[in-house]
Amino acid sequence: MSRVIFMGTPDFSTKVLEMLIAEEDVIAVVTQPDRPVGRKRVMTPPPVKEVALENGIEVYQPEKISQSDDLQTLIDMEPDLIVTAAFGQILPKSLLDAPKLGAINVHASLLPKYRGGAPIHQAIIDGEKETGVTIMYMAPKLDAGDIISQQAIEIEANDNVESMHDKLSFLGADLLKKTLPEIINGTNDRIAQDDDKATFASNISREDERIDWTQSAEQVYNHIRGLSPWPVAYTKLDDTNMKLYAARIEEGKKGNPGEILETTKKAIIVGTGSDDAIALTEIQLSGKKRMPTANFLSGYQEDLVGKELK
């Protein structure tokens, strides 16, 4: 069994870690520090930390690994392999050079497309029909290392970030499991990326979350599902933020962008920049719980038709 240091943070990483624990000797786990979560700001450990502790594996949580005392500790462990999956930090060269089999990353896109921290979100927002997972050697430049293996998966019309996240986390763990024997034996492929074909998926900003109603209905729909259920697209009703969790396209209903054209028992119909509208079917107003739009409409007293979402 190979001695592996694993680095990752969110739920996406846990499936890869669980596979490595079953197949190899995971000698340490590195993850982000515990963070405050929710309205009450409760300090919460990363999902990867919980898996590691359940399996008796030592955990390191440097704020920035390149400036941490943990860096030399990890190098001194003399790992055979470093594996990362959604770790969230670029590793210093001294750490990349430490393992004799190299440092590899499980990335949730078909590189060189969608380098960066939000590849699942961006692929859906862009209306891509497929995405996938890449196993790659790590390099000092973000997501630019040589490709070892890739596997594609379809993005279906009703997929959102949550559903694709789940599919890709299982796919990533499975592809790495298939690829590991070749990496350990030194028989794996090593294909340089074409930097000219690289696209980028930067972390989602607050401004990225806001809906632009002048876009087409298809673009708005992709934007909503590409941010659902996190970090969530939003718009404004009067002066109140409205988060948008689910929607569908209403073909052949044209109106001014952002104008509420009608309400049904289950949806708010909103005009876009194309000849089709968007039906909002699951929402959350500021200070309220997430709910089906039907529940919101049953208790809302004002007439929404004619109001403008901004």
Curated annotation (Swiss-Prot):
<dbReference type="InterPro" id="IPR005793">
    <property type="entry name" value="Formyl_trans_C"/>
</dbReference>
<comment type="function">
    <text>Attaches a formyl group to the free amino group of methionyl-tRNA(fMet). The formyl group appears to play a dual role in the initiator identity of N-formylmethionyl-tRNA by promoting its recognition by IF2 and preventing the misappropriation of this tRNA by the elongation apparatus.</text>
</comment>
<feature type="binding site">
    <location>
        <begin position="109"/>
        <end position="112"/>
    </location>
    <ligand>
        <name>(6S)-5,6,7,8-tetrahydrofolate</name>
    </ligand>
</feature>
<dbReference type="InterPro" id="IPR011034">
    <property type="entry name" value="Formyl_transferase-like_C_sf"/>
</dbReference>
<protein>
    <recommendedName>
        <fullName>Methionyl-tRNA formyltransferase</fullName>
        <ecNumber>2.1.2.9</ecNumber>
    </recommendedName>
</protein>
<dbReference type="InterPro" id="IPR041711">
    <property type="entry name" value="Met-tRNA-FMT_N"/>
</dbReference>
<dbReference type="InterPro" id="IPR002376">
    <property type="entry name" value="Formyl_transf_N"/>
</dbReference>
<keyword id="KW-0808">Transferase</keyword>
<dbReference type="Pfam" id="PF02911">
    <property type="entry name" value="Formyl_trans_C"/>
</dbReference>
<comment type="similarity">
    <text>Belongs to the Fmt family.</text>
</comment>
<dbReference type="InterPro" id="IPR044135">
    <property type="entry name" value="Met-tRNA-FMT_C"/>
</dbReference>
<keyword id="KW-0648">Protein biosynthesis</keyword>
<dbReference type="InterPro" id="IPR037022">
    <property type="entry name" value="Formyl_trans_C_sf"/>
</dbReference>
<dbReference type="GO" id="GO:0004479">
    <property type="term" value="F:methionyl-tRNA formyltransferase activity"/>
</dbReference>
<dbReference type="Pfam" id="PF00551">
    <property type="entry name" value="Formyl_trans_N"/>
</dbReference>
<dbReference type="GO" id="GO:0005829">
    <property type="term" value="C:cytosol"/>
</dbReference>
<dbReference type="InterPro" id="IPR036477">
    <property type="entry name" value="Formyl_transf_N_sf"/>
</dbReference>
<dbReference type="InterPro" id="IPR005794">
    <property type="entry name" value="Fmt"/>
</dbReference>
